[in-house]
Amino acid sequence: MINHKRLSVPRILTPVALAITLAACSSGPRQPDGVDVTLEPTQSVQNYMIQADSTEGSLRNDWLIMATKAAIQANQFDQAELLIKRLARQQLTEVQQAEWQLARATIQQKQGNYSQLLQLLNFKPWWKLPNEQWKDYYLMRADAYQGLNQAFEANRQLVAFGQYASSAEQREISSRIWMNFGSYSEYELTSLETEPNEDVLDGWLQLAVYAKTLSGNLSQLKNTLERWLSENPSHPAAIYTPEEIQNILSLDIVKPNNTALLLPLTGKFSPQAQLIRDGFVFAMMNDRNRDPSATLTVIDTNAYNADQIKQRLINKNIDFVVGPLEKENVELLHTTMDGSANGPTIPALALNIPEDVQPDSNICYLALSPEQEAAQAAKHLFSEGYNFPLILAPKGSFGERVTEAFNKEWRKYSSNKVAASYFGDKRQLQKDINEVFGLQESKQRIAQMQSLMRIKLETQPRSRRDVDAVYIVARSTELTLIKPFIEVAINPDAKAPQIFSSSRSNSGGATYEDLTGIIYSDIPLLIDPDPSVTAEMNELWSEQSNMEKRLKALGMDAYKLIGELPQMKVVPGYSVGGQTGILSIDNNCVVQRELSWAERGAL
């Protein structure tokens, strides 16, 4: 008889408990309750999708949002759009809704669809969100408005961003706000309006208006800015003052009282020097705000050596120098007045541009530069919508320099290659024009075909069709020959390119050939002069060629710039109307002259 033994309860439960414990250990890590969806993705889309598919509810939405962000980061926009549509059907928290909107907006931002971005990105003001999300929101909207050239609206978003920004970010935002306001004209600024609750934005606008309206009086501008900042110490502009405003506040405003004019009044360049001197004195005598005690010392640079000139500057207590004119003397200026043992530090406006311009806060440069004019022509042609320019210039180093200047500027705006041709002997002019327009090649191809086929073909040479604008650097006598040759070289059924010319063609003499339709550049004094200035100049100098007027205008602008250069150095984008153009400076203090353009009428 089999004896059955009873098993005790403790002995039965022990292996069961062990099995449960082992099962718990093998079930893997516990899923998190939530994911910080404001962070940047660190995994692939697939990894985030695996985690999303193994969860549910709000946590699944978190993983789907991270998968969406990973897809956008990898530029997988189709995948991202599918995930965005999937999320649109879910119940999202405020933080998730914000991140979903930011994801949609990021796709539009990457594709340059700024208007669409602004429509999609609209947080509710009552949402309780982390600061980082509000910062992303306002910054993305600011960038979108910037892309739409709506700088004021961009500033509105940047001011809102400032509520959540760190000190370092505040400083950067302040500079950006100030730069945006700098893109507006005085008239545009005064027409901008803020809302009643936009005190910070309104403060920035007030400062910008002051900077524009008082830019012609740096002393008054400095005093006004100092007073406003002291009255508004808690405004971001007072705490995180942009560098441009700091430069104005730190400026020691001293108007030159003893000016020296250095020119070669004898020798080869004497005629040009005397015309510049006459223009300078003309402007000085017409300056109603001139200090009666101010002095002018005119020094002939051919009558004294560098050491003698330096000593005269010291003896006369000169505090500003205009000149010299000759390039080699301009290069000596750095060593003569560099503030070292070689000489005193005296601010100067040189009347030529050396080959190698070195940044120097004390020396600026003004010249009637053909290279500057050619570069400006390239910019003008592009802004007018022309895509395939041809430049015609004289053979030799001068023509090569202006062509290179045109090319260099054109490359800033377009990858299209500039066609270039050089002309020389007038007897070869028609052949040169035919070659550049492809007429010679066309004739050769026709001749080859006739030779091969041994029959006379009824055809005519075809000119190239890829040139839509021609810029010509030529004298008026050369231009009168070039224009008809171009017209003959163009096929009757092709659209003729627009012809532009430099000021070199505007001699002021009588024109006996038809130059109708040619658009040319020149200084404002010759294209759009002030009638009162013209009348007074005609009274003083009855007969003046255009070249003589340009040199006098250079002297007039040299005088004007003595008072304007301090503003130009500290106010970005500052410009002033002059007789040789709209004047501004670049980073090397080379004066840039924006010329005027006009079209020649019929004879």
Swiss-Prot record:
- Alphabetically, which GO biological process terms does the record hold? peptidoglycan biosynthetic process; regulation of cell shape
Q: Where is the signal peptide?
A: 1-24
Gene3D superfamilies listed in its UniProt record: 1.25.40.650, 3.40.50.2300, Tetratricopeptide repeat domain
Going by the UniProt record, its keywords in alphabetical order are:
Cell outer membrane, Cell shape, Lipoprotein, Membrane, Palmitate, Peptidoglycan synthesis, Signal
Record-level GO cellular component terms: periplasmic side of cell outer membrane
Lipid anchor (S-diacylglycerol cysteine) at which residues?
Answer: C25
> A Pfam family name for this chain?
LppC
Q: What subcellular compartments does it reside in?
A: Cell outer membrane
Provide the topology term for how it sits in the membrane: Lipid-anchor
Positions with an attached lipid (N-palmitoyl cysteine) read C25
What does the record give under GO molecular function? enzyme regulator activity
Main subcellular localization, coarse class? membrane
Q: Report quaternary structure and partners.
A: Interacts with PBP1a.
So what does this one do?
Regulator of peptidoglycan synthesis that is essential for the function of penicillin-binding protein 1A (PBP1a).
As for family, the record states: Belongs to the LpoA family.
- This chain's protein is named Penicillin-binding protein activator LpoA
